[in-house]
Amino acid sequence: AIGGGIWAYNPRAQAIKAVKVGINQAIARAVGITYAETGPSHDLYQRCCAHNMFPSHNRQAFEDFWTGEVAGHSFRLFEAHLQMETKDSKGRTSRTTKFRGPLLEIGFSRKFHGTTLVTRDGAHRRFFIGGRKDSIKVASKTLDIAEMVNPEFEDAFDVYSDDQVEARYLVHPDYCEQLIAMERAFAGKKVKALFCEGKLTVILEAKQLFESGGMDAGRDREKLEMTL
């Protein structure tokens, strides 16, 4: 019975997968971009790891790659699933999800040369005494807390940078609302943004996305169009 169940499940899973890919490709064509189930992820993933944007993990998988150009800016969007795999004293393996959500990379129009990291308020806390850290070390760089002009932004986000002037130039007043709007669009949380190497990288935790095989293609398109 178990074998029969597996045999019956595989064609169903393959059919759902085929429907998902077909619908997502149609969504991509409709908005003038491309979609593929797999794609290049290593450089963006490593950039996020180097800047401590992910929780600790030892397994990673990526899917649902959207690429193209919007308003003259290249972009890449895909979903990451990061897990921690452990074994107990009896050798039994278990996996715990540490992060699931979209990774977005955009070719930025404003020229910049430093590194600026934007996180939700309190993401980097001092041990024991609490409060945000005055500086953090990531990717062999020291980023200092940046004092932003907009008090509402400071209440929601912490900004760390190795160029204070550039940080205030890049993170303009309405940026806070844009990040919060992205969180809402994906029903996500803990959004982070990184200005580095001439590109903007945004990640946030969210449930599995773009599963059009579940026949929620309209919602998938809404998420994608909002992001673009």
Predicted feature locations:
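Transmembrane-cytosolic junction motif
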Residues: 3-27
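Charged, low-complexity intrinsically disordered regions
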Residues: 29-31, 37-228
